[in-house]
Structure formats: structure tokens, C-alpha cells
Amino acid sequence: MANAAKRVLVLNGPNLNLLGEREPEIYGTATLADHVAAATSQAAELGLHLENMQSNSSAEIVNTIHSARGVYDAIIINPGAFTHYAWSIHDALAAFSGPVVEVHLSNPSTREVWRHESVIAPVASGTIAGFGGSSYVLDRKSTRLNSSHT
């Protein structure tokens, strides 16, 4: 009997709905839908079932994380600008019992100084940053590894 696919919630924060249009020199020309399609395909090969959500509202992200408890095996989050100040998202992720992977298309530590600190990192199993769209593929693999150790 085959193991059931692990359920992974993928959360994308503010302005990520504008990928492909907003600052393509930093974030590339692929849209969020492009990243989701590629990641979903790759995840299936790894035995993961992804469900994706994007919001420009921290309250909506917090409520989604609360609802994920007991439903999802892991969370992958690109918090966007919420990375640097959204303590409510930090606290919600801290209450989630599975692995959490923080992902960024760009490398925040090589950009403006205000982007260097993450309030999400302390509650994440790991962070993947700076690999463009490949970050979404890399994070699925890391989630599979992390979840086998929890």
C-alpha cells in the first residue's frame, strides 16, 4: 500500500501576485501562476500534494496558518515584505507543529539593509533564498527531508 502524499501548504505574501510584472530585474519574468505550476509538478514527483494561497493581508495569512493545524504536514512560506515585521505571522507559525520552510526568490541579505532581518526565520526549519524560481523547487525537497525527521 502506497503512502499518502504529504500535504503542504504554500503561502505567498504581499505583492507576489505581481510577479512577472513587478521589478523583473530582481524577481524575474515568471508569474506566481508559473511558479505554482512548476512547483506542483515537481512536488508530485516527491510525493507531496501542494495547496497554494496568496494574500496581501497578514490577517488572512494568520487565519490560514491557524486553519492548517492538523490538516497539513508542512508549510512553505514566502512572506514577502511581511518577513521583516509580521510578528503575528511568526506567532502563528510557532503554533504549527510541522516543518516550516521560509523561501525568497531574491536574497534579502544582499539587498537593502531593512531587508536583512527576518522575524520568520526563528520559527522556520530553514530558509532558502536567492535562487529565483528554483527556490520553490528547492523548498519542496527540503520539506520532504525535514518532514522525515520530525
Language-model features: locations:
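Short acidic active-site motifs
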Residues: E60-T64
